Amino acid sequence: MFNNESRPAQLLGIPQLKQEESTNFSGGFTGRIPSANLSITIDGYIIDIKDRVVLTGQFKGGNDTPQEQEISRLLQAANASRAAFFANAIDSRTSGIDVVVTHKAKLGAGSLSTSLAATFAQTTLEEVNTSSVLEGLEDTYFDRTSQVFLESAVPRTKINLTLNYKLNNLTVFFRNVYFGAVDEATNNVANDQEFAGKTVTDLSLGYQFNERLSFTVGANNLLD
C-alpha cells in the first residue's frame, strides 16, 4: 500500500484524495387501515456518490517504458512486488425501496402481532474516473472483482417476517429472515461463484413472572 503523495502514485497519475460528494433523493408513503389493524410504510431512495473512495487494484512495474522501469525500481526499493492506492476512482448509484407491513389481531385468548419488512436495494457502478496516464490500465485501477464486490457481494434483497404471540404472561416469538443471493468474483469469470439466498430462523419462548423477573429460552438460526 502506497500513499497518494508517493512517487509511484505520481507516475501512475493517481490524484490526491478529496472529499466524496453525494446527492440523495427519497420519498415515502404511510397508510393505515384501522378496521383491519393494518399499517403500511413504503420508502424509496436514490443515493448518488461522486468520486467515491475505493482501493485500487494492484499495479506493477515493467521494462517497456521509463515510467514502468522507475515504478519497478521503486517497488523493489520498498520490498514490494505491486502497489495499491486509495483513490476517488468511481461514481456509484444506490437505489432501493423499503416496505414494512404490520398487523395486530386477536388469536384465541391471546394477541398476535405480525410484521413483514422487505428491503430491495442495488448499487451500480456509474463511471470509472481515470486520468490520461492510466489509459490502458483501467482494468487494474478498478478491476472486475472490485466491481462485483461493489454491486453484488452483499444481498440485494432482505425480507424479515416476525410473529409475536402473547397470552397472559406467556410470549412466543418467531422470526424468519431471508437474505438474497450474493456473488463472489475473481478476475477469471470461470471461477466466479453465486451463493443462493438463505433463510435464518429464530424462535423463543418467554414467561413474565413479574415486572422484574422474566425467563426466555430460544434458539437463533434454529434450522442450521
Q: For each predicted feature, which ranges?
A:
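Solvent-exposed loop/turn elements at secondary-structure boundaries
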Residues: 1-20, 25, 33-48, 61-62
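Residues that define the transmembrane beta-barrel architecture of outer-membrane proteins
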Residues: 11, 21-25, 93-97, 155-159, ...
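Outer-membrane beta-barrel proteins
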Residues: 13-20, 87-92, 192-195
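Outer-membrane beta-barrel architecture
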Residues: 16, 26-30, 41-43, 88, ...
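Short, contiguous acidic/charged loop-to-helix segments that flank catalytic cores in large enzymes
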Residues: 17, 146-152, 189-196
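Repeated loop/turn-to-beta-strand initiation elements of outer-membrane beta-barrel proteins
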Residues: 35-40, 109-112, 169-173, 211-217
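Gram-negative outer-membrane beta-barrel transporters
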Residues: 45-50, 56-186
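C-terminal beta-signal and adjacent terminal beta-strands/loops
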Residues: 122, 176-185, 206-224
